[in-house]
């Protein structure tokens, strides 16, 4: 299930119109209609007691991951101090693994929540030749996709994900 804006095509699984206010409420648990409460949000790399890391499988961006908080929370400040630290440790761990295994030109981190108001962080390895670089993944396309580069990055993801799972501290998430 793709819940982030698909470049140029909109969003495939948004809640019904008018439901965003209800989805944005703090309080944990699960919220009906929230795609991250009702589904994984992508291919699960690992899932812990507090959060999961998924591979978002966004076309043109083979190394697009999300760190998704398990309980429904709309804002980072809805978490207590210990959970905020834990969440950022997970974001940092994903970023470090992407850097170590893929050597991207840049890592993009984003926590918007405007489309899906369930706390999640986008962690995206970016390469100078990608279709939108140096703009954000949601910016207009600047060039054609380099199929060879996309395939080369995608081929390295399984090893990177195994390393992510083996990283010390992963089990605490």
Question: Where are these predicted regions, by residue range?
Answer:
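HIT superfamily nucleotide-processing domains
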Residues: 1-173
């Amino acid at each position: 299930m793709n819940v982030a804006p698909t470049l140029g095509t909109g969003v495939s699984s948004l809640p019904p119109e008018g439901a965003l206010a209800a989805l944005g409420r703090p309080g944990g648990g699960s919220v009906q209609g929230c795609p991250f409460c009702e589904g994984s949000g992508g291919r699960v790399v690992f899932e812990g007691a507090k959060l999961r890391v998924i591979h978002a499988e966004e076309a043109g961006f083979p190394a697009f991951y999300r760190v998704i908080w398990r309980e429904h929370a709309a804002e980072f400040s809805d978490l207590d101090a210990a959970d905020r630290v834990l969440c950022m440790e997970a974001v940092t761990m994903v970023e470090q693994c992407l850097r170590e295994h893929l050597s991207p030109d840049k890592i993009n981190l984003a926590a918007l929540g405007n489309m899906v108001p369930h706390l999640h962080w986008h962690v995206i390895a970016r390469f100078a030749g990608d279709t939108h670089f140096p703009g954000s993944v949601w910016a207009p396309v600047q060039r054609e996709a380099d199929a060879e580069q996309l395939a080369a990055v995608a081929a390295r993801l399984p090893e990177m994900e195994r390393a992510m799972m083996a990283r010390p501290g992963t089990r605490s998430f």
